[in-house]
Amino acid sequence: MRTLIFALLFITALLAAYAATNNIHSHLLVDVGKQFVLGGEQVGAFWVSARNSGPVPVLLLERSGESVIVTRGRLEPGQSARLTFAAGAAVLVRNLGLQRAEIDLDIKGPSKSRMEYEPVPNN
């Protein structure tokens, strides 16, 4: 009986851990002068695998919960990267080119991820 209770508790814990995370795949199109925003409201860290599948370079930035923006990398066409982001951080995918950017993202982590486009701020 103890073994059965332990097994049920273990399975419940595994299901809860699985439900708390989410795997998302997205093929993004980012127009000239725009950036895509992912996240900003997660309660835990999350991971992003990105591959630039388009004709122009993209910039990957991290915006912290305090709105501090840090460059995390630049992806030329065909390049890939895997990055980890802290709880509450947002990933900014900024189009650096004069054509529409394309990028494939695989996101793993908490499922409360905001996704939207916004104009690139003036520097």
What are these regions (language model features)?
Residues M1-I5:
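Positively charged n-region of N-terminal signal peptides that target proteins for export
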Residues A7-L14:
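Bacterial N-terminal signal peptides
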Residues H25-Q35, G39-E41, P77-G78, G88:
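Tight coil/turn sites that cap or link beta-strands
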Residues G44-V48:
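Structural beta-strand segments of beta-rich domains
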Residues A50-G54, V93-G97:
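Asparagine-centered strand-capping/turn motif at beta-strand->loop junctions
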Residues P55-T71:
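Short, surface-exposed beta-strand/strand-loop-strand elements in extracellular ectodomains
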Residues S67-G88:
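Intrinsically disordered, low-complexity Pro/Gly/Ser/Thr-rich segments with frequent PxxP/GP/PP motifs
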Residues G97-N123:
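C-terminal partner/receptor-binding element of secreted or periplasmic proteins
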